[in-house]
Amino acid sequence: MSNINLLVFLRFLFIIISQILIFNNILIFGVSPNIYLIFLIIFPLNYNKSFMYLYMFIAGLILDLFSNTYGIITFSLLISSFLKIYFIKFSFGHFDASKVRKTADYIRETSLYQKITFLILMFFTHQLILYSVEAFSFEKFDWVVKKTVLSTIISIILSYIFILIFFNKNAR
């Protein structure tokens, strides 16, 4: 197994286990932070897309199993992984089609505004899909908006702290 494959797999295990054992048991203002989206955000851009979708599918299934959400997390993770490239283009103004640049390069070489825009787009979209499918009703629109906004804010703050604590400077 090459270094990049091993690194991706270890990050996968670490983030998923952290979500299951720690963050699923935390409630802040009635929402549980979803830090597992960090794995998608730091997933290497030069990695095979099929493997990215496979990792997201497996992560979603594992999280659904431990969260009793019946495929909702899997669905929202797969949609978010598909939209990641478009959010990079929107937030950073371009995307390297040759895949020479890494996600860390985009994050390191850009302004704070662009970084925050990218994180908000990723987390907000994921949370909106997650809670919309969970509610599956327009009658609960205010509940979906409240949960989406609170969960996005809390997840971004805790994810940033999580990255600062556990990942090196290259991953930021």
Label each region the model flagged.
Residues M1-R172:
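Terminal, non-globular segments
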